[in-house]
Regions:
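Membrane-embedded alpha-helical bundles that constitute the cytochrome b-like, heme-associated redox core
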Residues: 1-272
Length: 272
């Protein structure tokens, strides 16, 4: 209990020292800050999704992929990879908080936000430790079978709660895909940093992706991530672009870009 309170106090103190966050927290409240942070984190992850897909294209030429990974293995890129865990886990856990709020009537926002911040710190610290060790290994099939079962169970629980509501089908699929990704995306980031060779050695990456079960997992991730990301960007466009023609044009562009990246990702996964 004391550890949790000390952690909460440390996080709150750190955030209060950031002028921009502190100003809006005091004038608009923490829910406002959390909501905007969720959108910003989501947009960062969409940008990373595009970048990640682009880097994986070089798997068609293993020497080129290995050369790229040497650059991405530099100290600066390693720090950026670790920092990526912040928007990943924040967006993931806050999405879980929203699902609990909307569908399961858990309205104690103060407590939920404290858990959100505390668990985010724990995850980022754990990833940092694993990256520094760089010596861990696990059976890919066993790891992803466990995670897939957990993700599907969670997604089914959310689907059973939301499916009979009056919301649109697209809205429901956004929540269901979010529940699935709540497990799979943090798990993917952890898996890729258990050992440097897991994500940076072309031959090991290709060998893993040639397994039919891993292909199924990767394809599931691609479909869920692309849909969730596309819906999220469309929501931002709809909420903050008032000019109808411009909003429609952006929506079409978002759909086109997401379809292209989905096609590229699916084609790459199947062809390896």
């Amino acid at each position: 209990m004391h550890i949790a309170k000390n952690l909460e106090s440390s996080i709150s103190g750190f955030l209060d020292r950031i002028p921009f966050i502190s100003f809006y927290a005091k004038t608009r409240g923490w829910p406002y800050v959390i909501a905007w942070s969720h959108r910003i984190a989501g947009l960062i992850l969409v940008a990373y999704l595009w970048f990640h897909t682009y880097t994986l294209l070089s798997l068609s030429s293993p020497p080129l992929y290995d050369a790229s990974m040497k650059v991405y293995g530099s100290f600066l890129f390693t720090i950026l990879e670790w920092a990526l865990a912040i928007p990943v886990i924040f967006h993931t856990l806050n999405g879980g908080r929203l699902i609990l709020y909307e569908g399961f009537e858990m309205r104690n926002d103060g407590t939920m936000i404290r858990y959100l911040l505390g668990l985010s710190v724990v995850y980022v610290a754990l990833l940092g430790v694993l990256m520094m060790m760089g010596t861990q290994s696990v059976s890919p099939v066993f790891y992803w079978l466990t995670m897939l079962i957990a993700a599907l169970t969670l997604a089914y629980g959310v689907a059973s709660k939301f499916w009979k509501t009056q919301h649109s089908l697209l809205w429901k699929l956004q929540r269901i895909s979010g529940a699935f990704l709540l497990v799979m995306v943090p798990a993917h980031l952890l898996f890729m940093h258990l050992n440097p060779s897991v994500g940076k050695d072309a031959n090991i990456v290709i060998m893993r992706m040639q397994n039919w079960f891993i292909k199924f997992v990767d394809l599931s991730l691609i479909v869920m991530v692309i849909y969730h990301a596309g819906y999220g960007v469309m929501s931002v466009v709809r909420d903050y672009i008032s000019f109808r023609v411009f909003r429609t044009g952006l929506a079409v562009l978002v759909i086109l870009v997401m379809v292209i990246f989905a096609w590229v990702g699916i084609k790459l996964t199947i062809s390896i």
